[in-house]
Swiss-Prot record:
Myristoylation is required for the role of RING finger protein Z in assembly and budding. A zinc finger (RING-type) spans 39-75. Keywords: Host cell membrane, Host cytoplasm, Host membrane, Host-virus interaction, Lipoprotein, Membrane, Metal-binding, Myristate, Viral budding, Viral budding via the host ESCRT complexes, Viral release from host cell, Virion, Zinc, Zinc-finger. This is RING finger protein Z. GO terms for molecular function: RNA binding; zinc ion binding. GO terms for cellular component: host cell perinuclear region of cytoplasm; host cell plasma membrane; membrane; virion component. Late-budding domains (L domains) are short sequence motifs essential for viral particle budding. They recruit proteins of the host ESCRT machinery (Endosomal Sorting Complex Required for Transport) or ESCRT-associated proteins.
């Protein structure tokens, strides 16, 4: 008796979930031909940027968006959840 549907479910991992590549974290933004890179959400931050699909987000805006949903409010694609920090030189090469 009762709900017999609960017993028939299996605990298999969701194989349809696509793993995302790790997003790149930049402490100092690159300077480019068209000016400096900024966070596309708040437009103030130009340090500690995370690469989203085709734009940059600061850590603060990234965390606010992750609290609300898994999608980016700007490009409507999944937000990066894995971040890699590249090794940046602290001094010029000799």
């Amino acid at each position: 008796m009762g709900n017999c549907n609960g017993a028939s479910k299996s605990n298999q991992p969701d194989s349809s979930r696509v793993t995302q590549p790790a997003a790149e974290f930049r402490r100092v933004a690159h300077s480019s031909l068209y000016g400096r890179y900024n966070c596309k959400c708040c437009w103030f931050a130009d340090t500690n940027l995370i690469t989203c699909n085709d734009h940059y987000l600061c850590l603060r805006c990234h965390q606010v968006m992750l609290r609300n949903s898994d999608l980016c409010n700007i490009c409507w694609k999944p937000l990066p959840t894995t971040i890699t920090v590249p090794v940046e030189p602290t001094a010029p090469p000799p």
